[in-house]
Regions:
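Short, hydrophobic transmembrane alpha-helix segments
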Residues: 73-88, 107-108
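Hydrophobic transmembrane alpha-helical segments in integral membrane proteins
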Residues: 1-12
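Alpha-helical transmembrane segments
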Residues: 14-26, 422
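Flexible juxtamembrane loops connecting transmembrane helices in multi-pass membrane enzymes
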Residues: 88-91, 255, 289-327, 341-342
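A juxtamembrane structural motif centered on a specific transmembrane helix
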Residues: 25, 34-50, 415-432
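Alpha-helical transmembrane segments of multi-pass membrane proteins
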Residues: 21-23, 66-79
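Hydrophobic transmembrane helix bundles of membrane-integrated enzymes that assemble
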Residues: 52-72, 91-300, 349, 354-425
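TM-adjacent membrane-interface loops and short helices in multi-pass inner/ER membrane proteins
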Residues: 313-347, 354, 358-364
């Protein structure tokens, strides 16, 4: 994706030059042109065929999401071990087509002011730099999707995402239970065996299911019923008993509690402090992620020989997430724009992971956007979407798959914060 990342950046620069020249010719002065471009939302590369281009915005974005989801869910399953064409031919085809849909949506089907485009462009420039250093293809994918999510009907796009993900998952599960794709792949941990359901690792499958659950609940936001809370609870039970993905299961249970609260007493989420408390939760989880491991003391030669006892018990309950972060503090350097991480120590906490993989600048930007998105969603009354984002925050405490769009469709809710849009416009199609 290095070529696409560079191409999109160059195209955005070319659009800025083109629009400045056009505005200068229209207004007669550079100062007036800058003022118009800064405040007025306008299509890139001129407004030729704009009604038709605007009509393609949501379909292009939905197609990109569906292709991206199908690629990740099917081509990254154990089917890749059975057939070479899955990774050799199908995956690159789906991936490039998805990114081209996103690119066309960003460049040709969206209106921007230079104020919003400047903020988003700065984020993309930093993200591209981080991608080049970290080689994390999932990260650049989620960033491009967030940029492409501006002024689309998010529910319509999520329906395509959910349909593609559910269909691809059903195919993999059918192949798995038929004994065609990795029928006996299991993972042993502390004496227990965990089924991988055709994905090579239980947590990979757990993250995929969490993503589908969040997409489903986001789609049900305007018509939430007790059946939706029951679905969330059932998914949590399945994740706990099936692949034994505790983090994914606890996130589903937490989402169930939030949905139940929204159904029983929706006024709870309308209080004036709620948006600020929701935003503050990001700082709290981040502080716990970074500071709690500092209390560990190495007291033996084995990886799990840590004290004090109370903190060691918490670390054990989190399957060594704290001690792995403790080790990272001593093994890894912090690079300003990220780095390729070694396999050990494995950083499953998203806050620790992004500090080392993406660097402190990107980590601070992600945390700030997450907090701003939570504030905006609850401030504008989009309670269910805010609850989904809070559930992802819980998931991110013990898993780093929160940077995968397949696991984290709630990342698309950050788009409004990225472009500094009014919260009432988040997730809505652009007005004509």
């Amino acid at each position: 994706m290095f070529e696409f990342a560079n191409g999109l950046l160059l195209a955005l620069f070319a659009a800025a030059v083109f629009d400045l020249a056009a505005a200068w010719r229209r207004t007669g002065s550079v100062q007036a042109a800058f003022g118009w471009l800064w405040h007025k939302e306008h299509p890139l590369f001129g407004d030729w065929l704009w009604p038709r281009r605007q009509a393609l915005a949501t379909p292009l974005f939905a197609a990109g999401l569906a292709l991206y989801e199908a690629n990740v869910v099917f081509c990254n399953s154990m089917a890749r071990e059975n057939w070479a064409w899955v990774q050799g031919t199908l995956s690159p085809l789906l991936e490039w087509t998805a990114f081209l849909c996103f690119g066309a949506k960003i460049l040709l089907c969206t209106r921007y002011s230079w104020r919003g485009l400047g903020l988003a462009g700065a984020l993309y420039f930093i993200a591209r730099w981080v991608h080049f250093n970290s080689h994390n293809i999932w990260f650049i994918g989620i960033v491009v999707a967030i940029l492409a999510a501006k002024d689309v009907d998010l529910c319509r796009a999520l329906r395509a995402f959910f349909a593609a993900g559910a269909a691809a998952t059903a195919v993999v599960l059918a192949l798995h239970f038929a004994g065609i794709v990795a029928p006996d792949m299991v993972s042993e941990r502390v004496g227990e065996y965990r089924s991988t359901f055709g994905y090579g690792h239980p947590n990979t499958f757990g993250g995929l299911v969490v993503g589908l659950l969040l997409a489903w609940v986001m789609l049900r936001a305007r018509h939430l019923r007790w059946a939706d809370a029951a679905v969330s609870a059932a998914v949590g039970v399945f994740l706990w008993e099936g692949p034994a993905c505790r983090t994914a299961a606890l996130s589903a249970f937490f989402l169930t509690l939030l949905l139940a609260a929204a159904l029983v007493r929706p006024s709870v989420f309308r209080g004036r402090p709620v948006p600020w408390l929701a935003a503050l939760s990001v700082a709290v989880v981040g502080a716990v992620s970074y500071l709690l491991p500092l209390g560990l003391v190495k007291c033996g030669p084995w990886n799990n020989d840590f004290g004090p006892p109370w903190l060691a018990r918490i670390d054990g309950a989190l399957t060594n997430r704290l001690s792995m972060t403790w080790m990272a503090y001593r093994v890894h350097d912090i690079k300003i724009a990220g780095q390729v991480l070694s396999d050990w120590p494995a950083l499953d906490n998203s806050f620790a992971f992004m500090l080392y993989q993406f660097g402190p600048v990107m980590a601070a930007i992600i945390a700030a956007l997450f907090a701003a998105a939570l504030w905006g969603l609850f401030r504008s009354g989009k309670t269910v979407w805010g609850c989904c984002l809070l559930a992802m925050l819980v998931y991110s405490f013990a898993e780093c798959q929160s940077f995968h769009l397949t696991t984290n469709p709630t990342a698309l809710l950050l788009c409004g914060a990225v472009f500094a849009m009014p919260p009432n416009r988040w997730g809505e199609a652009s007005p004509s």
